[in-house]
Amino acid sequence: MCIRDRYYKPANVGGLVEWCAAVAVAAPELPFYYYDIPSMTRVSFPVDQFLREASGRIPNLAGVKFTNLDLVAYRRSLDAAGDRYDLPWGTDEALLGALATGARGGVGSTYNWAPRLYTNLIAAFERGDLETARRLQSTSIAMVDAISATGFMGTSKALMARLGVDVGPARPPLDNPSPTDVNALLQKLLSLGFDEWGAKGP
């Protein structure tokens, strides 16, 4: 998965495609995914247009991780992708809306410690139990809000360490939570049902 350079920005979709092609050609035997996350890169080109232009330029293009809350753009992109490209949804707090729009799956950071929350949400959606799916999506939103209160990246890493997967701290300039913050977070997550849907620690 490849994210666009965060300093120099392409002027148009064609420039983005050329940049991705230069990266993809370095590993032609591997599937190439472009990571579309405008909130971080400050670059927002239509993914459907990217797919059309990249289809003849990047032979190993497999899809795009779509991390953008614009469901209209997502539907357009799914239509452009057809069965040829994979477009996993990337905003955990809006998975239910994406499923209704046509998502077939997602790639999310909070899936690491809340796997059953999301598999249960997807299962509820697929059986038509929207009440349960909405409740689980609300839980996801509350969980993300709780983690974000002390800095999402650093707190996510600290939570993973508490669950037995030490991925190290966040690097500066990002902040890391104190042990007290992490203890308070775990209590908050338990109040949201973490013991039912969260990952199990050692």
Residue ranges and their predicted role:
Residues 1-3:
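Short, small-residue-biased leader/transition segments that mark boundaries at the very start
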